[in-house]
Amino acid sequence: SVRPFVIGNRSSLEQALTETGVTCAIRKIDALERVEPAAGVIDVLEPTAFDCGSINIGQVSAACGHEAVKYFEHAVELAQRGEIQGVVTCPINKEAVHAAGYHGDIGHQEILARMTGSALTATMLMTPGLKVAHLSTHKSLGEAVAYVKRPVLIEKLKLTADCLSRWSSKKPKIAVAALNPHGGEGGMLGREEIEEITPAVTDLQHMGYDVVGPYPADSVFYRAIAGEFDAVMALYHDQGHIAIKVHNFEDSITATM
């Protein structure tokens, strides 16, 4: 059975419950063995001593950014030791993390990559009826466009296909979204489809992967929702995030591959 608990600060969680009017008991634990799921009770493990009394709600805080990273790092360490079987994260304030001095760790994905020594990672957003992997996430739009390169596409699509294969017994079919309007219109609106994306798709097909595209971004997600594809590879943050959140915001999750 699932035995959930929170890694974080008990006082800040109690304050949040008060602010939101939620009635729930907070129980501090000092060891995982003490986790005892009960209705109306949240078990909290505090890995650090942190005084949140001076924190102003709604303002970016370097101290809070530091604590958020430390809590997540502790969760990852527990998972690496096999003491827990999964980690679920809440949104992290990237500005606070940056203010705390973690300039390379923009979000959870970067922290996971650092702690696991993974050179290749990617983000996948999932909601019932739609899965969207992302070639890039935490890059400016200009940087994201420059990142659309054949070798990167091949590696990220292979990673996506391999992860999907672990979740299902069937061979996944992945569609690649185009970067430019109308898929570039034969090069008139951009040449990334011709010079980078299509060659990457062709290479993967020769390797045996069921990868197709590029297809215009204004239709590929609709086709995936209709069941034509198992997943879509979006080429930058908002291209994929908007599709997922418009389709089903409330039931969407993010997974790091």
Go through each PLM region and give its residues.
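Pocket-edge structural micro-motifs
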Residues: 46-48, 136, 257
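Contiguous, glycine/small-aliphatic-enriched amphipathic segments in soluble metabolic enzymes
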Residues: 1-108, 151-235, 239-253
